[in-house]
Design a protein with these regions (language model features):
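Short beta-strand segments that buttress and anchor functional surface loops
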Residues: 70-79, 479-484
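Beta-lactam-recognizing serine transpeptidase/beta-lactamase-like catalytic domain environment
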Residues: 266, 300-334, 347-507, 511, ...
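Short solvent-exposed beta->alpha transition segments
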Residues: 9-10, 24-71
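Small/polar-residue-rich segments within soluble enzyme cores
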Residues: 71-73, 100-104, 119-125, 129, ...
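Second-shell loop/turn segments in exported
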Residues: 2, 14, 30, 34, ...
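Short, low-complexity N-terminal intrinsically disordered segments enriched in polar/charged residues
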Residues: 1-17
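Short pre-catalytic segments that frame enzyme active sites
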Residues: 108-125, 139-150, 155-159, 253-354, ...
Length: 528
């Protein structure tokens, strides 16, 4: 602008400096309407709070002694490759109190008005990727869910509200009761709670009854859920994390303008690239449903984990409601190894070239890693533990030295990996996404061939024992059944499929085999 700085230039320069500092209060004082300017600029900086900005006066032209026009170049940065630039024009006038910027919201940002707001948002590619199963069918898709909440501030009778809502949703959510909702509210510190999420079909039927209940709030939210409501598994939560990671990796950004009532006006800046590829999950939904049929036949916590030993693909993970109350115990539950210690003892005997009866508890525990138990696998999206062993010098997955079988605690996931190692002849890294096997920093010793031969013989012999009689009607099945305290274990193989069964508080020695028989029968039965 050169030459002697005029009063109009001085005001514009000071205005840009204060905007750069995001000092909206002092910047507003340089306008003709400080209250409105302060409110607008406060919202702008809060809505774009992660950004930095540079306002630069590019030109100020005096029209006469009382007014001037100016231009500003504005550059926002919201992170790497997230830049937005624009040019603004405005007027500055000499008032009784001095030179002031003639206020209008568009003097700081295009398309702003007194009633509009601006916000920096994260954007996602459309359509989002879906999760497909092993055969390539849709496993999980993003759908609009109807989120049913209870807002305690909107009802004077919480007991009446919770009981009425529980009655209304009972046809689709029989486990949600008035007392269980009251328990949720007791821990919510007066905040609304989510009672249930409903698919559109269920919502359409139940909405009239729910709408009459005081304190019930109904909202629509997108969520990744199973394409088939029959498919339920803790593995879905892990796949949801993988899907979210994909969304994060392809996320874009946008500066968006909204009306006072929240209606979207336009996006004035931003970029959104293409969506990521579909997530290729390893789950086989037909096998998963068979596993679900099996676990619900048990009256105590029961889990099934099935793996394809040729690839390490986790093809099914099922828990009954009793198990789910305790969390994703198929992956993270730890239980005494019990009689399955004989498998580890067999490995130790072959490795150390000594009779099994001479193998110590400590040696058997240390041999568990050769079957993948006690190995810390890092599997995308999955929180898991294979087991905890009392091995000196091993800083992870340790417990105090126990007596006998208590020296090793195992998870159903870990025992499925052990079954896969017996079938394959070596530990195979597990995976829940095709082509993305787990990794580990834990040294995994090779299985000696004599150990492999003996372990397979134990599985072949096991199918002829009384406790596995329920499985003898199925072709090519081998099995090893054992108990650990009051719990039952079963490791089974059938061709390129292995699975581990765990049941807490078994009622008989053949409980795990009977559950496995339900699985195999369901798998052999054509679906309608």
């Amino acid at each position: 602008m050169g030459g002697k700085t005029s009063e109009s230039e001085t005001v514009v320069q000071r205005f840009t400096e204060l905007l750069d500092e995001q000092d909206y209060g002092k910047a507003a004082d340089l306008t003709s309407y400080p209250a409105a300017a302060s409110a607008t600029m406060k919202q702008m900086f809060e809505g774009l709070q992660s950004g930095t900005v540079d306002y630069e006066a590019s030109q100020v032209i005096d029209l006469d002694k009382q007014s001037a026009i100016f231009s500003m170049e504005v550059a926002w940065n919201f992170g790497e490759k997230k830049d937005w630039t624009y040019t603004l024009q405005g007027t500055v006038r000499k008032l009784a109190i001095g030179w002031r910027i003639s206020w209008e919201p568009a003097v700081v940002m295009p398309q702003l008005t007194d009633n509009r707001t601006v916000k920096l948002v994260r954007t996602t590619a459309k359509p989002p990727p879906k999760v497909v199963d092993l055969p390539g069918e849709a496993l999980m898709t993003e759908q609009t869910l109807n989120v049913i909440k209870i807002d305690p501030s909107r009802t004077g009778d919480l007991v009446g509200t919770t009981n009425a809502l529980a009655d209304a949703i009972e046809p689709v959510a029989p486990l949600i009761t008035g007392p269980s909702l009251m328990q949720q509210l007791a821990g919510s510190q007066g905040q609304p709670i989510v009672a249930v999420n409903l698919r559109d079909g269920d919502f359409a039927i139940l909405e009239p009854r729910m709408a009459k209940v005081p304190g019930v709030v109904m909202e629509k939210q997108p969520k990744l859920i199973s394409a088939d409501r029959r498919t339920r598994s803790p593995m879905l939560d892990a796949l949801r994390k993988v899907w979210q990671d994909s969304l994060d990796a392809t996320a874009g950004w946008g500066v968006q303008i909204f009306e006072a009532d929240g209606r979207f006006v336009s996006q004035v800046a931003g970029y959104q690239g293409p969506s990521g590829p579909d997530i290729a999950a390893t789950m086989d939904q037909r096998l998963q449903r068979a596993a679900e049929d099996a676990v619900v036949s048990a009256g105590t916590p029961a889990t099934v984990v099935a793996i394809q030993p040729s690839t390490g693909a986790v093809v099914a993970v099922a828990q009954n409601s009793y198990a789910t109350e305790k969390g994703p115990i198929a992956f993270t539950g730890l239980f005494p190894a019990g009689g399955t210690m004989e498998l580890f003892r067999t490995v130790a005997a072959a490795t150390k070239n000594k009779p099994p009866q001479d193998v110590t508890v400590q040696e058997a525990a240390e041999a568990a890693t050769a079957l993948g138990v006690g190995v810390d696998f890092k599997v995308a999206g999955l929180d898991e533990v294979t087991g905890r062993i009392s091995a000196p010098g091993r800083s992870t997955e340790q417990v105090r030295q126990g007596a006998g079988a208590d020296a090793v605690q195992v998870s159903p996931f870990g025992m499925a990996i052990a079954a896969a190692a017996i079938s394959r002849g070596s530990v195979v890294p597990p995976m829940i996404v095709a082509g993305n096997p787990g990794t580990t920093d834990t040294p995994v010793p090779a299985l000696p061939q004599p150990a492999i031969d003996r372990l397979r013989a134990m599985m072949n012999d096991g199918i002829n024992k009384p406790e596995t009689a329920a499985l003898r009607g199925f072709r090519d099945v081998t099995a090893f059944a054992a108990t650990g305290g009051a719990d039952g274990w079963l490791l089974a193989t059938m061709g390129d499929l292995v699975f581990a069964v765990h049941i807490a508080d078994v009622d008989s020695g053949d409980a795990t085999s009977r559950l496995a028989a339900v699985l195999l029968k369901s798998l052999a039965t054509p679906e309608p």
